[in-house]
Amino acid sequence: MIPIVVEETGRGERAFDIYSRLLRERIVFLGEQVTNDSANRIVAQLLFLEAEDPEKDIFLYINSPGGSVYDGFGIFDTIQHIKPDVHTVCVGLAASMGAFLLCAGAKGKRSSLQHSRIMIHQPLGGARGQATDIRIQADEILFLKQKLNTELSNRTGQPLSKIAEDTDRDFYMSPSEAISYGIIDNVLNKKPVSVL
C-alpha cells in the first residue's frame, strides 16, 4: 500500500501518493530491484524533472539490492545525459546495480546515510540451452562486466585492475570505506535544526 499525503491549498485539500509528493520536491526514490518497470519509471521522472527545470538539481534516493544491468544502464545513461546535476543518496543498501547508480551521481553530490551498506560485484547470469547459446550469453556477461568495471574505474578513480579484483566476489563497504573507494563523496548525518 502506498501512503497518501493530504495537503491544504487555497482551493481546499489535495491528496497525493507519497512518491508524487516527493517528485514535486525533485526527489526520485528507487526502493526496489532495478527492473524494466522500475527503470522506465525512474527515467521518466528524471526526464520530467529536467523538462520542468533544467537548472535545478535532482535527488535520487537509492535502497536497492541491484537488478538488471541493461535497465540499470538506462538509468545511468539518463543521469549522465540530462542537464541537472543528480545527487545520489544511499538509504539502507545500494548493492550491485544499486551501487553502480549511487556512483553515477554528480561528483561531490554522491552520499550515503551513516548506517547504509554499499556492495559491488560482477554481473550475475544464468544460461541454459545449447552450447552455442551458452557461449553467446557468457560472452555478453563478460562484455557487461568489462563495461561496468570501466565505468566504475572512471567514476571512482580506482585502477581497472583493482575494480576487476574487488568485483570478482561480493565486496561490501561502509559509507566511510565507500568514500575512500570513490563511490561516494560524503556521509550524511542529521540535518541541522534551525532555531527561530
UniProtKB/Swiss-Prot annotation:
Q: Give the primary localization class.
A: cytoplasm
Q: Kindly state which keywords UniProt assigns to this record, in alphabetical order.
A: Cytoplasm, Hydrolase, Protease, Serine protease
Family the entry assigns: Belongs to the peptidase S14 family.
| Function according to Swiss-Prot or TrEMBL | Cleaves peptides in various proteins in a process that requires ATP hydrolysis. Has a chymotrypsin-like activity. Plays a major role in the degradation of misfolded proteins.
Superkingdom to which the source organism belongs:
Bacteria
Q: Which HAMAP family match?
A: ClpP
For this protein, the record's SUPFAM superfamilies field holds: ClpP/crotonase
Which top-level enzyme class is recorded in the Swiss-Prot or TrEMBL entry?
hydrolase
Pfam families attached to this UniProt entry? CLP_protease
Kindly provide the name given to this protein in its UniProt entry: ATP-dependent Clp protease proteolytic subunit 1
**GO CC annotation:** cytoplasm; endopeptidase Clp complex
CDD domains on file: S14_ClpP_2 (cd07017)
Instruction: Tell me which residues this entry annotates as catalytic.
Output: 96, 121
Reported EC number(s) for this entry are 3.4.21.92
Q: Which PROSITE patterns match?
A: CLP_PROTEASE_SER
Which BP terms does GO give this entry? protein quality control for misfolded or incompletely synthesized proteins
**Listed PANTHER family:** ATP-DEPENDENT CLP PROTEASE PROTEOLYTIC SUBUNIT (PTHR10381:SF70)
Q: Which gene encodes it?
A: clpP1
Q: Which reaction does it catalyse?
A: Hydrolysis of proteins to small peptides in the presence of ATP and magnesium. alpha-casein is the usual test substrate. In the absence of ATP, only oligopeptides shorter than five residues are hydrolyzed (such as succinyl-Leu-Tyr-|-NHMec, and Leu-Tyr-Leu-|-Tyr-Trp, in which cleavage of the -Tyr-|-Leu- and -Tyr-|-Trp bonds also occurs)
User: Where is this chain's protein located in or outside the cell?
Assistant: Cytoplasm
Q: Which GO terms describe its molecular function?
A: ATP-dependent peptidase activity; ATPase binding; serine-type endopeptidase activity
